[in-house]
């Protein structure tokens, strides 16, 4: 271990990474550089600086970076162009944040001359894979330290005992227990552990922190509009906004109306199933709006092909392959499809739902003249359908004739 002189730690200031900070100092006898990413998690981050200083990290080795705009612009929005949902439901709020954190970890390692980077992901979860695949893709020779795979602290009980033995404060929630395992950023908040580990038990309402209970949401619906240019949201209710500002505003609306709650049992990349509770208020509104604008601007063939590619694209992000050539290849195709995804979507927000109720676009492929039930003035000859059906039925008739 003597070859490790300096480590950059992805540091939240919470219990796990505070224990890791002390453990790195004790075990590796090395300098530790802390990096705390502001991804819009809604927490005051200066306490992380104070705690790092208290544990012996000098000011010039404490990095707290505001990455909110980069996060939404370069990671969330490209993913949303693909309509990505892992296993049909999960909007990938944790998964999509990991490559950006890894990217900045590697940048800081280069800036400070560090020998290694470290993270607080456990050996059971997906995050260890996401952090490390991204790190190796960006810096093939980097050393990655994953304490949960090295030390003998095999449970949260053991972790808390170690923390108390080394005078590291252990936070308590309002119920007098150690907190749930949570992750938060501008896109979502996730909770795992304790009562959530039983997939039969309904999530207690006190676990939810980002949305009101839909039953308690306003009794009057609220209507909003989102403007899109080339597949990306650019304005809310006619007011131009940056990517992060737009998502934050949608989060406020989603919170108010109880939108974006998801109770999910998912298949982890490492092989086990896990149960998590996700709150993605603004992301759910945005995702539905993006689908809405695509519905009138994308050709059927392109739209259906995108839907076929989406599960693979979502799986690549979930599994940690953001920086892989296959993800970049799919992204190029997806981005090409968005060239004319322009226009405005109107949504109705009401008691947990975000419904598209209107859409318009200068690039609309919707032709009211062709689709009308009234006189179409010769736009469409219904007799043409007979030949279309006959040709498409040919193979079915031949199969039937052979008794197949």
UniProtKB/Swiss-Prot annotation:
The UniProt record lists the keyword Ligase: yes
UniProt xrefs under PROSITE patterns: ARGININOSUCCIN_SYN_1 (PS00564), ARGININOSUCCIN_SYN_2 (PS00565)
One GO cellular component term: cytoplasm
Subcellular location(s) per record: Cytoplasm
Reaction(s) catalysed (UniProt annotation): L-citrulline + L-aspartate + ATP = 2-(N(omega)-L-arginino)succinate + AMP + diphosphate + H(+)
EC nos: 6.3.4.5
Binding site for L-citrulline: 90, 95, 126, 130, 181, 190, 266, 278
Keywords (A to Z) from UniProt: Amino-acid biosynthesis, Arginine biosynthesis, ATP-binding, Cytoplasm, Ligase, Nucleotide-binding
Biased amino acid composition, Polar residues: 179-192
Disordered: annotated segments: 173-200
Coiled coil spans: none
Membrane-traversing stretches: none
Annotated SUPFAM superfamilies: Adenine nucleotide alpha hydrolases-like, Argininosuccinate synthetase, C-terminal domain
Matches recorded under InterPro entries: Arginosuc_syn_C, Arginosuc_syn_N, Arginosuc_synth, Arginosuc_synth_CS, Arginosuc_synth_type_1_subfam, AS_cat/multimer_dom_body, Rossmann-like_a/b/a_fold
UniProt binding sites for L-aspartate: 122, 126-127
Ligand binding (ATP): 10-18, 37, 120
Pathway: Amino-acid biosynthesis; L-arginine biosynthesis; L-arginine from L-ornithine and carbamoyl phosphate: step 2/3
Gene Ontology BP terms: argininosuccinate metabolic process; L-arginine biosynthetic process; urea cycle
Pfam family, one: Arginosuc_synth
UniProt GO molecular function: argininosuccinate synthase activity; ATP binding
Stated family: Belongs to the argininosuccinate synthase family. Type 1 subfamily.
Subunit-structure text: Homotetramer.
Official protein name in the record: Argininosuccinate synthase
Organism of origin: Novosphingobium aromaticivorans (strain ATCC 700278 / DSM 12444 / CCUG 56034 / CIP 105152 / NBRC 16084 / F199)
């Amino acid at each position: 271990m003597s070859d490790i002189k300096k480590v950059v730690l992805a540091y939240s200031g919470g219990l796990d990474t505070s224990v890791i900070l002390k453990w790195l100092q004790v075990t590796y006898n090395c300098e530790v550089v802390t990096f705390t990413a502001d991804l819009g998690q809604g927490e005051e981050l200066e306490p992380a600086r104070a705690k790092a200083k208290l544990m012996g990290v000098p000011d010039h080795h404490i990095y707290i970076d505001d990455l909110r705009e980069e996060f939404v612009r370069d990671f969330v929005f490209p993913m949303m162009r693909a309509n990505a949902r892992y296993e049909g439901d999960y909007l990938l709020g944790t998964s999509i944040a990991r490559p950006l954190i890894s990217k900045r970890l590697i940048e800081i390692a280069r800036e400070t001359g560090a020998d290694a980077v470290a993270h607080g992901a456990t050996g059971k979860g997906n995050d260890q894979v996401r952090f490390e695949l991204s790190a190796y893709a960006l810096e093939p020779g980097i050393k990655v330290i994953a304490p949960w795979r090295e030390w003998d602290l095999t449970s949260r009980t053991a972790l808390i005992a170690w923390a108390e033995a080394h005078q590291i404060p252990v936070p308590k929630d309002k119920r007098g227990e150690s907190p749930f395992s949570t992750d938060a950023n501008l896109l979502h908040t996730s909770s795992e552990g304790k009562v959530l580990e039983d997939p039969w038990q309904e999530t207690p309402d006190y676990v939810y922190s980002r949305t009101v209970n839909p039953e308690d949401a306003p009794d009057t619906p609220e209507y909003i509009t989102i403007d899109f240019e080339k597949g990306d949201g650019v304005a809310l209710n006619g007011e131009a906004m940056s990517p992060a500002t737009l998502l934050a505003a949608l989060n406020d609306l989603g919170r108010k109306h109880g939108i974006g709650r998801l109770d999910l049992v998912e298949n982890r990349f490492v092989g086990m199933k896990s149960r998590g509770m996700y709150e993605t208020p603004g992301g759910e509104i945005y995702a539905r709006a993006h689908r809405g604008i695509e519905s009138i601007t994308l050709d059927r063939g392109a739209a259906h092909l995108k839907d076929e590619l989406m599960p693979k694209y979502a799986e690549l992000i979930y599994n940690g392959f953001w920086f892989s050539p296959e993800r970049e290849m799919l992204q190029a195709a997806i981005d090409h499809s968005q060239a004319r995804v322009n226009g405005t979507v109107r949504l109705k927000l009401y008691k947990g739902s975000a419904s598209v109720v209107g859409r318009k676009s200068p690039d609309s492929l919707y032709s009211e003249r062709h689709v009308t039930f009234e006189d179409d003035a010769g736009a469409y000859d219904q007799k043409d359908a007979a030949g279309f059906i006959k040709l498409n039925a040919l193979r079915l008739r031949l199969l039937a004739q052979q008794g197949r």
